[in-house]
Structure formats: C-alpha cells, structure tokens
C-alpha cells in the first residue's frame, strides 16, 4: 500500500503538462534575455557569449532545453536582436521557447 501511495505521489509530482512546461521554458527564456540585455549593456558581447557558454555547460532540465534552442538559433543573432532592442518575448518566440 505504501508503495502505491508513493508511486501516485511521485507521478502527480512529476506530471507537468506540456502547456505548463512551455510556460516554464518561456519564463526562463524571457528572464535569460533580460539578464543578457543587462550583461550586454554593461560588459559587452564577449561576456554574453561567456555567460551562455558557462550556463549551458552546467545546464540540465529546462535550462538545457533552453540552451539548445539558443545555440541552435545562434548566439550572434541573439545578441543582434538584443542590440536592436527587440522585446524579450519576441526573441523567445523567434527561438521557439515561447
């Protein structure tokens, strides 16, 4: 009986819907873009590249998914969009994270 209860609790705890996963990924993405915008303004493009590289080397779960999307899109293109003052939600939509 304890095993069944444990399995049910475990299943419920990890039963995240695709919509909820998408919301999490989108929120992570917009937060990342805002962080990168601040970093780009204060430290420059090389620091943005270093930050993304460092983050992605340690990433797992949703962060790893986001890293894959960012790297597939291209860091230089991402930096250009940030420099062009494109909204974080629009950037995340372009990289298919929102």
UniProtKB/Swiss-Prot annotation:
Where does the signal sequence lie? 1-21
Keyword Disulfide bond in the entry? The reply is: yes
Question: In this UniProt entry, which residues are annotated as the site Essential for homodimerization?
Answer: 96
pH-activity profile: Optimum pH is 5.2.
Q: What is this protein called?
A: Pore-forming peptide amoebapore A
Mind telling me which SUPFAM superfamilies this protein's record contains? Answer: Saposin (SSF47862)
Q: Which InterPro entries match?
A: SapB_2, Saposin-like, SaposinB_dom
Q: What is the lineage of its organism?
A: Eukaryota, Amoebozoa, Evosea, Archamoebae, Mastigamoebida
Q: Subunit notes for this chain?
A: Monomer (at pH below 4 and pH above 6). Homodimer (at pH 4-6). Hexamer; formed during insertion in the membrane.
Keyword vocabulary terms for this entry:
Antibiotic, Antimicrobial, Disulfide bond, Signal
Q: Which residues form the Saposin B-type domain?
A: 22-98
What Pfam families does its record include?
SapB_2
Q: Species name for this entry? A: Entamoeba histolytica (strain ATCC 30459 / HM-1:IMSS / ABRM)
The listed locations are: Cytoplasmic granule
Q: List the disulfide bonds.
A: 26-98, 29-92, 56-67
**Where is it mainly found?**
cytoplasm
| Single GO BP term | defense response to bacterium
> What is the stated purpose of this protein?
Forms pores in the cell membrane of host cells. Has antibacterial activity against M.luteus, no activity against E.coli. Implicated in the cytolytic activity of the parasite.
């Amino acid at each position: 009986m304890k095993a069944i209860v444990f399995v049910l609790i475990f299943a419920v705890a990890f039963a995240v819907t695709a919509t909820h996963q998408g919301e999490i990924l989108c929120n992570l993405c917009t937060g990342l873009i805002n962080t990168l915008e601040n970093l780009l303004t204060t430290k420059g493009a090389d620091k943005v590249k270093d930050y993304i590289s460092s983050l992605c080397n340690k990433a797992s779960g949703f962060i790893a998914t986001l890293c894959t999307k960012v790297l597939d899109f291209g860091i230089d293109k991402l930096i250009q969009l940030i420099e062009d003052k494109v909204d974080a939600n629009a950037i995340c939509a372009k990289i298919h994270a929102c």
